[in-house]
Structures are given as structure tokens and as C-alpha cells.
Amino acid sequence: MKNLVFLKPFSIKNPTLDEQNDFIMNEVFVEMECASLGEMYDNDKLYGKELETFIPKEVIDKHPDWVIAVGKCATVALGIRRQRKVLLNPKVSYEHLNNVTEFDRENTYGFFDDLHEQDYERFQSVFPHAMWFPQDDNLSLFTIKEVVEEIINGRTVA
């Protein structure tokens, strides 16, 4: 099984040393714990790239079974059609909700933390596989790793 995993890129303007260290440590932890999910695209691979063109090109070139994406990468991946996706905290615009195929409706899963409630509401209006975590304001791929494994391995997820 070939999957592509796009982690959250570093996007803090004028970060403090603590913010930089926190990001790096979290990314290393997620990479180590979630390596079995697929080929990882961490900040080193994403840095300086135009995500809006880079991510779709990687998907076209590599033909993955699943795309797993976090944050801004999830927002970009949401716009890719005819591709199985697991998305964590994408920013959902009304443009993303237009012309959605039945394949995309059935094969796109979205997970949202408390800070992305409005995105969750928009997403679940079109996509039936949506989950909101109201008690969590910093949902990570590691937090939902077991659920993601169930999805990409074809097991039923309630």
C-alpha cells in the first residue's frame, strides 16, 4: 500500500525559539510514531514549495492509494478530486464543496479540532465522514493514528 502523508508546514511569522523548538519536536514525534502510514512529507520537503501546485503534482506523479494531510496541506488536498483522502483540520471554503463526486464524498474523511468548528460544519454538510473533537484544540495526526490506520486498511470506522 502506497500512501502520501503531508504534515503541517511551519507557518509562524517571526517565531520565538520556543515556538520553533516546539514545532520541530512535535514534527519529529509525529514522523516517528506515524511512519507506518506512508511516505512522509515533512517541513524539510515542503519548505519553499508552492503547496497548491506541489501537492497535486506529487499525487499525480506517485498515484497513492491514500493522501493523508494536515493543516494547509489538508486544505490543498481537499481540492484534489478522485483521490482517497484523510484530512486533519483543512480550511474548508464553499469552493471546496462544489462539484463533489460521489467517489469523493465516500472516500474523503475529515477530522477537526475545537479551533476548526466552522470548517467542520461546512465539511460535514457535503462529506459524511467528518469528526469533530470539541475538547481538543490541538489535534495531531498521532492523536488519530489508529483511526487513520483503520480507514486506510479498509476497516469500517464508526
Where are these regions (language model features)?
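Short, surface-exposed "cap/lid" segments of acyl-processing enzymes
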Residues: M1-C34, M40
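Catalytic phosphate/metal-binding cores of nucleic-acid and nucleotide-processing enzymes, i.e., regions
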Residues: F6, L37, Y47, P56, ...
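Alpha/beta-hydrolase active-site loop
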Residues: Y41-D61
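Residue in the alpha/beta-hydrolase core beta-strand immediately N-terminal to the catalytic nucleophile
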Residues: D65-I68, R84-V86
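Gly/Ala-rich beta-loop-alpha elbow adjacent to hydrolase catalytic centers
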Residues: V67-L78
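A conserved short beta-strand
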Residues: R82-E95
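The feature captures the conserved acid-bearing segment of alpha/beta-hydrolase catalytic domains
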Residues: V92-T143
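Catalytic active-site module of serine/aspartate enzymes centered on a nucleophile-bearing elbow/loop
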Residues: L139-A158
